[in-house]
């Protein structure tokens, strides 16, 4: 299964593996594959964006990689069965902490039809960034800002308050 998607497994424990993982990213880019990184380093409760880990963006600093592009993408869950999701219900959608993936996925699928927003931000050539930390900060600001706009809870709370519904 992972060979179909060309999955690159990232070790968050073994810092010595970062160089090898960067080489895999570089090789895949040179072979014209897109690489998607989830830079938070772990998952959150969906209420905020965690600080980004910039180490795997180190390919940006390599001179032979300057013509490649970097495109931040925001992924957010905003509606359940067509109804905007109130802030306090977001943790039911997120997989985080010590949650068992299978039982969480089963509960998630039982919630109803969930709408996912994907926002593709402007691609930028690697050469536009001073270093990996600058690229990471740029992506963090774009993504966290978009999450706030997508999760506009003041607007959501005016539309409907899910906690006011009672089961008959």
Model-found features: residue ranges?
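Cytosolic-facing loops and C-terminal tails of multi-pass membrane proteins
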Residues: 133, 138-168
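Membrane-interfacial amphipathic helices and adjacent loop/beta segments
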Residues: 1-27, 120
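Short helix-loop-beta-strand segments that form the rim/entrance of peptidase-like active sites
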Residues: 7, 33-34
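Glycine-rich phosphate-binding loop signature in dinucleotide/nucleotide-binding domains
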Residues: 28-32
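A cross-family acyltransferase "interaction/gating" segment
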Residues: 14, 33, 45-130, 134
């Amino acid at each position: 299964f992972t060979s179909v998607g060309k999955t690159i497994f990232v070790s968050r424990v073994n810092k010595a593996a970062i160089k090898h993982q960067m080489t895999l990213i570089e090789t895949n880019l040179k072979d014209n594959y897109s690489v998607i990184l989830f830079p938070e380093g772990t998952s959150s409760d969906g209420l905020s964006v965690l600080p980004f880990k910039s180490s795997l963006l180190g390919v940006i600093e390599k001179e032979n990689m300057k013509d490649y592009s970097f495109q931040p993408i925001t992924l957010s869950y905003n509606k359940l069965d067509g109804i905007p999701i109130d802030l306090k219900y977001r943790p039911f959608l997120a997989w985080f902490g010590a949650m068992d993936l299978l039982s969480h996925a089963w509960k998630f699928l039982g919630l109803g039809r969930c709408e996912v927003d994907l926002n593709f931000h402007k691609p930028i050539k690697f050469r536009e960034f001073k270093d990996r930390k600058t690229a990471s900060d740029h992506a963090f600001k774009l993504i966290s800002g978009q999450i706030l706009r997508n999760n506009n809870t003041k607007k959501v709370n005016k539309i409907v308050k899910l906690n006011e519904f009672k089961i008959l």
